[in-house]
Amino acid sequence: MFRVSTCKCDFCKDAAAPIDSTGTLDDLNDIQLQHAQIGGLKETFDTDSDFMKAVDELVRKNILIKVEECRFFKVDDLKHSQPYLIPEAVNLLRDMGLEFQKRLKEKGLKSYRFLITSMLRTDESQHKLGRHNSNATTNSAHCYATTFDISYNKFYDGDSLQYSPKAFAVFTQTLIAMRQQCRFLIKKEYHQSCFHITVVVCRETLLKCQ
């Protein structure tokens, strides 16, 4: 599921779209959408059926990767999205998991896993979600396979779902450190109890894909 290595560029200097280093987890959705449109899928999908017809070829070409449960995270039962992301976003999930596990170990805590609650959406699924979620805008970064949601109040100890204030604190510290490195853009969505995260792609990666 994971690529061998993450791009070694300085994301704050070499990002494909403008980004500043900050420890605040409150990036505007419009900025996340800008990064998604530049770094993600060049064409989004109108319907879930359209996506299913195209997904095998996109995976074969390494444009998309299927995201599956691993030692770093669990994947929720996705009702309004598909478990696929661009390789750079999958790499980011791995790096987040590695950093989270390292910080948990340093504090003598259990090896908690975080929970991914949303990934790639089609226009159809985004429209359906908008009926229930006020945060679901018509044109979403989720449609470009660059963006995922992670629950901030649910963590897994083995296969046991828990709320752990200590795990939440360590995970938040992990996110702050990685946001300061400009690895992603992030917004805490209180209505959905999740972190809305968009991967930052560097210019070098985009040039290689052209």
PLM ranges: what are they?
Residues 92-107, 135, 153, 174-181:
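Structured segments of extracytoplasmic/periplasmic soluble domains
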Residues 137-210:
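Catalytic cores and adjacent binding grooves of peptidoglycan-active enzymes
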